[in-house]
Amino acid sequence: MKEKVVLAYSGGLDTSIIIPWLKENYDLDVIAVCVNVGQGDDMDYVKTKAIKSGASKIYVEDVKEEFVVDYLYKAIKSEALYEQDYMLGTSFARPLMAKKLVEIAHKEQAKYICHGCTGKGNDQVRFEVGVKAQDPTIKIIAPWRIWDIKSREDAIDYAKKVGVEVPVTKKKIYSVDRNLWHVSHEGGDLEDLKNEHKEDMYFMVTPPEKAKDEPTYLEIYFEKGVPVKINGEFLNPVDIIDKLNTIGGENGIGIADIIENRLVGMKSRGIYETPAGTLLYAAHKKLESVTLDKYTYQYKKLVSAQYGELVYNGLWFTALREAIDAFVDKTQENVTGTVKLKLYKGNIKPCSVDTEYALYDEGISSFGESELYSHKDAEGFINLFGLPCKIKALKNF
């Protein structure tokens, strides 16, 4: 009986040609696993294609709700970003995929897990660290670090040679990653920074200048930092993301053209569509500004950046990630209320906040006197606060 390898399978270019390559070079029984995180593919087609390409079996794991509840909710509550721009759509999906790969490897008693990540990318780290953190005895096969194929053009040629159909041509060469949270586009003419990215690549977002001419008003209700209602309607977690993707997309919301510093050392360029995430972060930030005290609000921004880098670097299965989540959950205890946004041609304008947990007090914040604050109090505060500056000036050195 042949030994088994579990392949992270998408039906795209890389994983499509890996099946015959594994059989040719390793003589392994290939078990394909497609983890459905909302990439929008025809799963019946993916199943058929995997078997036609030579897999002995394929699992399709629908984990969209788990993706939202156990991963994207953490993104929203923490407002995690990498380098202030990237909303981590790929990064949050990879640990869940790694988890499912290990589960099926155990079920099938497979000794190997294989992925189609390139040797220059971050995903190879995310997958492999995720696997090692769960089962360090499983061996990894990473074809892009081994085989003679050096480019996507070479991969297309190999696919033709072995008779594998692929949804990419040399004329349309972008590498695309899609899930409920985002769509990313990399490669091709994007690698030349002098090239403006082409708007016809978008999957979810209407170009802002072509978006509708009337503004859209949107209300999002959060409960302990998690979105539960859209425009007054309770929706399940997956439907909330889908609905906000539609609303944001038709208003030109959520396009980012980013140069990022990869974990493996080089810079890369990606075009990202994240309409739901962009809306949720904007609304959540506004609600936090009203419900969190000054010191928690400011410190959480530092933690959010650390969390974003940790997730980007593939360190999901760590004590630090769990500890940060515990801190974030504590901060979200009173992040409950409704935020109203105005959307227009790529722009988001927060209009109002309605929450019973507001730390903003109109009576104190107005220009008049109040029981808690007297204008006269300011003089003593300023004298103490500015004392170091005054001493420095008096010393005159």
Swiss-Prot record:
It is found in: Cytoplasm. Homotetramer. GO terms for molecular function: argininosuccinate synthase activity; ATP binding. It catalyses: L-citrulline + L-aspartate + ATP = 2-(N(omega)-L-arginino)succinate + AMP + diphosphate + H(+). Keywords: Amino-acid biosynthesis, Arginine biosynthesis, ATP-binding, Cytoplasm, Ligase, Nucleotide-binding. Pathway: Amino-acid biosynthesis; L-arginine biosynthesis; L-arginine from L-ornithine and carbamoyl phosphate: step 2/3. This is Argininosuccinate synthase. It comes from Clostridium botulinum (strain Langeland / NCTC 10281 / Type F). L-aspartate binds at T118, N122, D123. Its EC number is 6.3.4.5. The keyword Ligase applies. L-citrulline binds at Y86, S91, N122, R126, S175, S184, E260, Y272. The keyword Cytoplasm applies. One of its GO terms (biological process) is argininosuccinate metabolic process.
